[in-house]
């Protein structure tokens, strides 16, 4: 997969090169890495460490998975962009915010066709959802560690998508035109 399409091993390139079924497998595996590190590994480490806040340990474990995915030693430190793994991490930390961010991403793809833009918009919307969802759901406010993480995450996503941003500026970014269900059809 690294020799075709964009050369990235992430779900978007797998979709473009191999189709939706292999891309779904990649997305599930990437998401599982983030979810597992937060939901399963972090509590194990929390019991063995002196850090008094499980949320901090969860974020550290999850972000370690994201960094391992993004800068994998198995591919010369050139991995994916981290969106799927961050999504799995968010699913474990704050499932309702995950669903809202996913909705932002899907709507962005439907209206623009740009997956990179969807990833950026979803990440930028996260701190807003982390802040406004608890009162609507009748739950406690998000812990400070999660709020800080949600404010920093968009910078990471923008960093990993810097080449896509340049392609967007140059009008060279690939679109998923089939996903753009509201676009005008070309008439021949």
Model-predicted segments: where are they?
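C-terminal ends of transmembrane helices
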Residues: 68-78, 104-112, 162-166
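Cytosolic, membrane-interface loops and tails of multi-pass inner-membrane proteins
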Residues: 1-23, 166-188
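Hydrophobic alpha-helical transmembrane segments
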Residues: 24, 55-63, 87, 96-103, ...
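Multi-pass membrane catalytic core of lipid/isoprenoid biosynthesis enzymes
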Residues: 16-42, 75
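Helix-coil boundary and interhelical linker segments in multi-pass alpha-helical membrane proteins
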Residues: 39-60, 91-98, 132-148
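Short, non-helical or kinked segments that cap or interrupt transmembrane helices
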Residues: 1-11, 74-87, 114-123
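Interfacial segments of multi-pass membrane proteins
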Residues: 13-20, 41-45, 82-112, 124-134
């Amino acid at each position: 997969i690294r020799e075709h399409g964009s050369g990235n091993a992430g779900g978007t390139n797998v979709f473009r090169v191999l189709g939706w079924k292999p891309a779904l497998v990649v997305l599930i595996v990437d998401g599982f890495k983030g979810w597992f590190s937060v939901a399963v590994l972090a509590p194990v480490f929390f019991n063995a460490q002196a850090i008094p806040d499980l949320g901090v340990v969860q974020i550290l474990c999850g972000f370690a998975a994201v960094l391992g995915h993004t800068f994998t030693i198995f591919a010369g430190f050139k991995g994916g962009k981290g969106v799927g793994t961050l999504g799995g991490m968010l699913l474990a930390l704050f499932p309702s915010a995950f669903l809202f961010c996913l909705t932002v991403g899907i709507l962005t793809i439907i209206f623009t066709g740009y997956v990179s833009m969807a990833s950026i918009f979803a990440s930028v919307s996260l701190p807003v959802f982390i802040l406004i969802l608890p009162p609507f759901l009748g739950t406690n406010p998000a812990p400070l560690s999660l709020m800080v993480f949600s404010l920093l995450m968009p910078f990471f996503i923008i960093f990993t998508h810097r080449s896509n941003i340049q392609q967007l500026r140059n009008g060279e970014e690939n679109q998923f035109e089939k996903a753009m269900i509201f676009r005008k059809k070309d008439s021949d």
